[in-house]
Amino acid sequence: MSASYEPNERRAYAASLSRFRYDDGNDRSTLNLSADQRLLSRPYFLLNGLANLYTSRSSRDDAPYFNPSRDASLELGLRADHLAWRDYDNHFRHRLSVNAGRYWQEGYGSAWIPSLSYRHEWQWAMGRVLSYGVSWARPVYDGARETRYGFDAELRWGE
């Protein structure tokens, strides 16, 4: 179940509550709250502050997959959005997001978790958008820090 509220283009809030029932008898519940607040608006540049709070719990801590009995995180970040080129319905923009926060897992304590992402967005007609990006993060699982690199792409076709 999820809900979002955007009172205007400068502010947005979202909340989600999920329950997962696995075949092995594990029940996992999660709660996620997020906020996005515009800090600076210029004709071709936007700067937003980001906040995210997450917590989860599971009924089984001996599962053969990553499944903490309880965990939580709080992240704060900034997203810079630059509209580099625009011609009527066509544009190119790029975005840089920088986040840092604290992750806690029962039995393993807490650790800082940084992340970065950089994206391009090309729109060549109304509703026709190609977006792609790279990301880097240093999450912690069962007390061990890992490095995660990512690439994703999205093609939107329609209004």
Regions found by a protein language model. Give the residues of each.
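Membrane-embedded beta-strand positions of outer-membrane beta-barrel proteins
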Residues: 3, 13-17, 47-51, 76, ...
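Short loop/turn motifs that connect adjacent beta-strands in outer-membrane beta-barrel proteins
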Residues: 5-10, 38-48, 84-93, 123-129, ...
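Outer-membrane beta-barrel "beta-signal"
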Residues: 145-159
